[in-house]
């Protein structure tokens, strides 16, 4: 029984250490991402728009198209459509 507990404890410790290592790697990657955003900001890029583009690129094509159609529908309903401004 004691051997089983020892093996289980070692296995648990291994999982914990792997998770801790991955958490550190995740923090490092997040730091790198912040650096890229900072550099883009310094060069005049709009970070909010970049983040929106990244979010859209993660979506599958059908979901993205559906969201864009809904957004356009809502904007037109509120008189915010660019096309409506052009036709006036």
Curated annotation (Swiss-Prot):
Belongs to the UPF0335 family. HAMAP family: UPF0335. It holds the Pfam family GapR_DNA-bd. One of its GO terms (molecular function) is DNA binding. It comes from the Bacteria. This is UPF0335 protein WRi_003770. NCBIfam families: PRK13694.1.
